Amino acid sequence: MSKSILKTFGSNARRLRLRRKLTQEQLAELSFLHPNYIGGIERGERNLSLINIVRLSRALQCRIGDLFAGISTSEKSDN
């Protein structure tokens, strides 16, 4: 998976978290994820499972698509 995809996803997650005025710790609690994992997502270091994407979306009260804003489906994978 392209690192730019992970970075864009992480930036979106951070932007949405800050919009809700949540700390990483608060988001972690709401999404049932570890605070270190939230930090890794925001830095583009974590490749999330579908379940964790849904958890994050619910905790942020956003559409799943909002987390993928700016990510093109035509990007090639660089594994």
Walk through the language-model features, giving the residues of each.
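Conserved hydrophobic/aromatic packing and binding residues within compact polymer-binding modules
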Residues: A13, L27-A28, I38-I41, L67
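Short, charged recognition helix plus adjacent turn
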Residues: R58, F68-N79
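Residues within helix-turn-helix
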Residues: E25, N36, V54
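DNA major-groove recognition helix of helix-turn-helix/homeodomain DNA-binding modules
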Residues: I51-D66
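Short basic helix-loop element that most often maps to the first helix and adjoining turn
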Residues: S11-Q26, L30
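Recognition helix of helix-turn-helix/homeodomain-like DNA-binding domains
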Residues: F32-L48
